[in-house]
């Protein structure tokens, strides 16, 4: 077996929930963070360098999440982690609801697994990633690619690959302000009435068929939610204003991406440019600087180079 001394992992961003799929549904999209791990000869335990627009916000010591995941895998296989140089190139905005933490977890675990000689299977890496993150909706598509629905069973996690119709275009509006996942979770109730639970179950089923067929009426109906969005939207300035603009421009529906504050609209190639312009203008009218772009679904997941 050839022992690697360096490995680079490219991990896609993710948009989670898609409305009713709270903590269980997510899709990989075409924004990326890259993590390079190189075994070091020096006695320095870890040296981390970060590049990218938001690099100053990322920890460069042992508290770095990618490095913590790297160490966690070695602990899991009962080995001492090597001294390592970590180079991170950021392409996924931080604290925006695009799975930046999931990229770090997946990148760190995969980097460690490769340098350790691949002792863990992809499923074992996935299980460890879910355990670290606490929920599967971001880490699973970040690892595997595509749109994934994940559920826990008595035998472990079950992952379904959800077909995404090629005519459906995801448009993301990324604002210049952050929203912590902790704050976004704090406003969510701990208990729900039965009718709201039934509502989400029904609409998630409709959404999955809409994603598969590209049928606009199912997408519009399927993205409705009563579990998290009604409580989180108040944390996002101009949410209803931007949503109205997106729908008037032809989007099927607009939802919060992950914990927010990024907003996700699903549309098609005929209306995507109008939706982009409408969402940009609407948020700017609310005094929010935003980057709005049409992305693609990443079907490969995390890859090595």
Curated annotation (Swiss-Prot):
Keyword Ribosomal protein: no
Positions contributing to ATP binding: 93-103
GO cellular component: cytoplasm
Pathway in which this enzyme or protein is active: Amino-acid biosynthesis; L-threonine biosynthesis; L-threonine from L-aspartate: step 4/5
GO annotation (BP), single: threonine biosynthetic process
Keyword annotations of the record: Amino-acid biosynthesis, ATP-binding, Cytoplasm, Kinase, Nucleotide-binding, Threonine biosynthesis, Transferase
Family: Belongs to the GHMP kinase family. Homoserine kinase subfamily.
PANTHER family, per database record: HOMOSERINE KINASE (PTHR20861:SF1), HOMOSERINE/4-DIPHOSPHOCYTIDYL-2-C-METHYL-D-ERYTHRITOL KINASE (PTHR20861)
Stated role: Catalyzes the ATP-dependent phosphorylation of L-homoserine to L-homoserine phosphate.
Listed name of the protein: Homoserine kinase
Species, as recorded: Trichodesmium erythraeum (strain IMS101)
Underlying gene: thrB
